[in-house]
Amino acid sequence: MIEVSGVSVRLSGKTIISDVAFTARAGELTAIAGPNGSGKTTTMKAISGELAYGGSVRIGGGEVKGLKPWQLAAIRGVLPQASTISFPFTVREIVRMGLTSGLNLHPDKAEQTAAAALASVDLTGFEGRFYQELSGGEQQRVQLARVLCQIAEPIVDGKPCWLLLDEPVSSLDISHQLTIMTLARNFCERGGGVIAVMHDLNLTALFADRIVLMKSGRLAAAGSIGEVLTNETMLAVFGCALRINQVPSDGTPFVLAHSAISRP
């Protein structure tokens, strides 16, 4: 379980997020959503241990700011929103970096682990390509493969591991969006936990168990998809008169963007 309690972050003397609190459970996909600049990425960086914070962030009972980098690397993998690499690394070299940053439980199977990670993100055959030669979406999937090498198992020694994904599908076509979200969903079903910063509310409704909505650096709403995705919440958080509908087959909510546009 990841417990976020009263978390605040200040950067350059300015408060970016204030008093954020929610719980993410292993076996579930928790989405963080909200308008641009609402504090989603800052919240994720506090959870991952990348930013100093006030309040408390606990992973499996341990306070994040009290854990050493190697301890964090063993229990959580982080996919950043963007990754710029100046040196001409190949895809194989970048993916294998994940093997050196995590526990690497099976060093004798390093090549198989890297190959499986690339296959899971539909990049088999890209091993020898240079990272800079790839499209933005391909680079994003390479970075996810690296994370999957670092956190290759959802449960280690009986304790869940975590994937912290900041906008994991932002550069992807719809087919690969579904591939990556299914991968994240499967990680949860195998006992791990996922927190993902998301913009696509329909993908969020389709794959997430719980959603945390942020606005202006504060928590606006948190709960199940059905509890949070309402017409009233959409108007309060996004300022759009969006209409929430439901898929007839199972009642999954979806956002009808057309409803926010006035046509003559």
UniProtKB/Swiss-Prot annotation:
It is a peripheral membrane protein. PANTHER family: HEMIN IMPORT ATP-BINDING PROTEIN HMUV. Its main location: membrane. SMART domains: AAA. Part of the ABC transporter complex HmuTUV involved in hemin import. Responsible for energy coupling to the transport system. The complex is composed of two ATP-binding proteins (HmuV), two transmembrane proteins (HmuU) and a solute-binding protein (HmuT). It comes from Rhizobium johnstonii (strain DSM 114642 / LMG 32736 / 3841). It is an enzyme of class 7 (translocase). Keywords: ATP-binding, Cell inner membrane, Cell membrane, Membrane, Nucleotide-binding, Translocase, Transport. ATP binds at residues 34-41. GO terms for molecular function: ATP binding; ATP hydrolysis activity. Its EC number is 7.6.2.-. It is found in: Cell inner membrane. InterPro entries: AAA+_ATPase, ABC_transporter-like_ATP-bd, ABC_transporter-like_CS, P-loop_NTPase. SUPFAM superfamilies: P-loop containing nucleoside triphosphate hydrolases. Residues 2-241 form the ABC transporter domain. The lineage of its organism: Bacteria, Pseudomonadati, Pseudomonadota, Alphaproteobacteria, Hyphomicrobiales. Belongs to the ABC transporter superfamily. Heme (hemin) importer (TC 3.A.1.14.5) family. This is Hemin import ATP-binding protein HmuV. GO terms for cellular component: plasma membrane.
